[in-house]
UniProtKB/Swiss-Prot annotation:
Ion transport keyword on record: no
Xref: InterPro entries: Ddc1, DNA_clamp_sf, Rad9/Ddc1
Location of the region described as Disordered in the Swiss-Prot/TrEMBL record: 512-543
One Gene Ontology CC term in the entry: cytoplasm
Keywords from the UniProt entry: Cytoplasm, DNA damage, DNA repair, DNA-binding, Nucleus
DNA damage keyword on record: yes
Gene: DDC1
Compartmental location: Cytoplasm; Nucleus
The name this protein goes by in its record: DNA damage checkpoint protein 1
Subunit structure: Component of the checkpoint clamp complex composed of DDC1, MEC3 and RAD17.
Length: 543
C-alpha cells in the first residue's frame, strides 16, 4: 500500500467532512499533497484571488502511513525537496474532484461511521483497475461497509508561501522589540514570536525566505500589520451580516477596531435608477478585548493626516471568509484567529491553529484607500505593540466572574454573625413542664429525638447536640443563594418579644409528640380507623 490514513474518532470525522465541504466551495478541484508526517489539502478559485489551505498532522489520524518507494504508477506526482538543514523530503501530489469527495465523506443520515479510511495503491502488484484511484472505505456501526474509488490526476506541488513570507516580515519588523517606549512588551506576544520563528525554521519550503537578511532601515514597503483575537468576535460580526452583504472591511487603530460588512450601491447613470441598494453594518470592538495587535505607522506624506496614518484598513470578500470560518465551527471550543495584512491591494492572511489541524486563508484585498504617489522616504514611527496583558482578555473576564461567584458561594460566617441572622425556622425555647415530663418517658424518648431532627433542620449547621455553638460553621446555601433575613447583631429583637410565636410552636410540638407516643404503643390499643361499629382487628377466614 502506497498510502493509508484511517479516522476512527467521530469528532475528527466531522472535522474531515466539514473541511472537504469548505474546500469544494472555493473550487471544484482539491489538491492533495502527502508527506511523511502530514497531509496538505488546498484549493484556489478560478480568478486566483482566494486560496484555502488545510494542514493535517499525522496525529490527526488514527493510522497514517506513507511509502513513496512503493509508488511505481503515477510517478508524475512524486517530487523530492531539500530544506535548509539538508534533509530530503519526498512528496506525492494529485488533484481530485472535491464535489464528489465531499459527498462520499458525508456522515450517513441514520448511522454512525465506525472507521473511515483513505488509501492509494500504485505499487507493481496493484491491478490496473485501481491505479491512480483514491480508495475510500466507510465502515458503519450497523456493520455496513461502503467502498468508493474516485480517480485522481497526479501533479507536481507548487507551494504558495505567502504565509512564510508574511511571518518572516512580521519577525523582521516586530520580533526584535522587547520593549516599546520604555514599556515592557506583552510576554505572551514575545512567546508568540518564538513560536513563529520555530515554524519558519521547521518549514520545508523556507528556502530563500528564512535566510533573507533583515532590512537595516524600515521603509513603507516593509509594512506588515498583525491582529490576533478570539474567534467569538469574528463570529459575532459574521452573524450580523445579511446575505446581501458582499464585502468586509477591517479598520484597526490603537484604541478601536471596527468590522464593517457592506455592499456598494449601483446606480444607472442615464435614468438615475438604483440598481443595487447600498448596505452597511458595523461592529465596533475595543482593542482591550483582542489578544494582540501590532501596527506599522508612517508619517511624512503631506497628503495623509495623522488619523489616516494610524488607521490600518483591509477590504476583502465576505463570502470566502464566511466559508473559511464555517470550517472552524466543526469544533465546539473557540480558537484564536491570527491575521496579517499589509497595504491595500496586498493579500491578507488568516490562520487558525487547532494543534493537529491548521487552517489558512489568503485573500486579495481591495485597492480602495491606497495612497497613490506617496513619498518613497517616510519616517517610521516606533512599533506599536499591544499592551501588556498576562492572560487572554476574554478568558480573564470569565475567570474573574467565576472567582467572584465561587467566593460569594463559599463565604463562611463566624458564630457571632450566624446567631444574629434569623434563619428559616424559629429557634427552640424551653418546653413546658408537661411537655418535659412527657419527653422523659421511655416510650417517647426515641420519638422525641426524631421530632427534634425533623423540626431543627436549620439548627444543625449552627448548634451542636448539647446546644452550644458549633466551631466550624457555614451558611446554609441552595443553588448559590442563602435564605436569611433580619437585622444585624446589634438590632436583633429580644427573645421575649417572640414569646407568642414560641408558644404556638410548642403546642404544635406537644401535639406531634403525643401522636408519635400514641403510635408507639401496643397494637391492641391502637386505632386502625375501621369505624365505630367495626372490630379493631377483623377476623381471618381461619379464626
Amino acid at each position: 500500500m502506497s498510502f493509508r490514513a484511517v479516522i476512527t474518532s467521530s469528532e475528527h470525522q466531522a472535522v474531515w467532512s466539514r473541511l472537504i465541504l469548505t474546500l469544494s466551495t472555493i473550487n471544484q478541484d482539491i489538491k492533495f499533497t502527502i508527506m511523511s508526517n502530514e497531509l496538505i489539502l488546498w484549493s484556489m478559485n478560478s480568478t486566483d484571488t482566494t486560496m484555502y489551505q488545510v494542514r493535517l498532522k499525522a496525529s490527526f489520524f488514527s493510522e497514517f502511513s506513507f511509502d513513496p518507494g512503493n509508488i511505481v504508477f503515477g510517478e508524475e506526482g512524486l517530487q523530492v525537496i531539500e530544506d535548509l538543514q539538508k534533509q530530503q523530503h519526498t512528496l506525492y501530489s494529485f488533484v481530485i474532484n472535491g464535489r464528489h469527495l465531499s459527498i462520499l465523506s458525508r456522515k450517513p443520515e441514520y448511522d454512525n461511521i465506525k472507521e473511515f479510511s483513505l488509501s492509494i495503491d500504485n505499487s507493481t502488484a496493484a491491478p490496473e483497475a485501481i491505479i491512480n484511484r483514491l480508495h475510500i472505505r466507510v465502515y458503519t456501526e450497523s456493520l455496513i461497509t461502503k467502498e468508493f474509488s474516485p480517480a485522481f490526476n497526479p501533479v507536481k506541488y507548487d507551494p504558495i508561501v505567502i504565509d512564510l513570507k508574511y511571518k518572516k516580515k512580521f519577525l523582521d519588523v516586530y520580533g526584535t522589540e522587547e520593549s516599546v517606549n520604555g514599556e515592557q512588551a506583552d510576554p505572551r506576544l514575545l512567546d508568540f514570536f518564538r513560536q513563529v520563528r520555530k515554524q519558519l525554521e521547521e518549514a520545508k519550503f523556507n528556502e530563500g525566505i528564512i535566510d533573507a537578511p533583515r532590512p537595516a532601515e524600515l521603509r513603507s514597503e516593509h509594512e506588515i500589520n498583525f491582529l490576533s483575537m478570539d474567534s467569538l468576535i469574528w463570529r459575532n460580526a459574521i452573524d450580523l451580516c445579511t446575505n446581501n452583504t458582499e464585502e468586509l472591511k477591517l479598520d484597526l487603530t490603537m484604541n478601536k477596531m471596527v468590522i464593517t460588512a457592506f455592499t456598494k450601491g449601483v446606480q444607472n447613470m442615464k435614468s438615475s435608477d438604483v440598481l443595487k441598494q447600498a448596505i452597511s453594518i458595523s461592529n465596533s470592538v475595543s482593542t482591550e478585548d483582542v489578544e494582540h495587535y501590532c501596527l506599522f505607522t508612517t508619517s511624512g506624506n503631506p497628503g495623509m493626516s495623522k488619523k489616516d496614518a494610524d488607521s490600518k484598513q483591509a477590504v476583502f470578500k465576505l463570502r470566502d471568509f464566511r466559508n473559511f470560518f464555517s470550517a472552524n465551527q466543526a469544533w465546539k471550543e473557540n480558537a484564536t484567529v491570527n491575521c496579517w495584512f499589509c497595504s491595500p491591494g496586498d493579500p491578507i492572511l488568516f490562520e487558525i491553529d487547532r494543534g493537529h489541524v491548521k487552517l489558512s486563508l489568503v485573500q486579495i484585498t481591495d485597492t480602495a484607500g491606497k495612497a497613490v504617489g506617496a513619498a518613497p522616504d517616510l519616517a517610521i514611527h516606533p512599533v506599536l505593540v499591544s499592551p501588556r496583558k498576562p492572560v487572554s482578555p476574554l478568558r480573564a473576564a470569565c475567570t474573574n466572574t467565576n472567582a467572584a461567584s465561587n467566593a460569594l458561594h463559599g463565604v463562611q460566617l463566624d458564630a457571632a454573625n450566624m446567631d444574629a441572622i434569623k434563619t428559616l425556622f424559629v429557634q427552640d425555647v424551653e418546653i413546658g413542664v408537661s411537655a418535659a415530663a412527657m419527653a422523659h418517658s421511655p416510650a417517647n424518648r426515641c420519638t422525641d429525638e426524631n421530632l427534634r431532627s425533623m423540626c431543627s433542620i436549620s439548627q444543625q449547621g449552627q448548634h451542636s447536640c448539647d446546644g452550644s455553638p458549633a466551631t466550624n460553621l457555614r451558611r446554609v446555601s441552595r443553588a448559590g443563594t442563602t435564605i436569611a433575613w433580619g437585622a444585624g447583631k446589634d438590632h436583633v429583637m429580644c427573645p421575649d418579644s417572640d414569646y407568642g410565636v414560641a408558644q404556638d410552636v410548642n403546642q404544635l410540638k406537644r401535639r406531634k409528640v403525643g401522636e408519635l407516643a400514641h403510635a408507639s404503643q401496643s397494637p391492641e390499643s391502637q386505632d386502625y380507623g375501621l369505624g365505630p361499629t367495626q372490630q379493631y382487628q377483623p377476623k381471618g377466614i381461619f379464626d
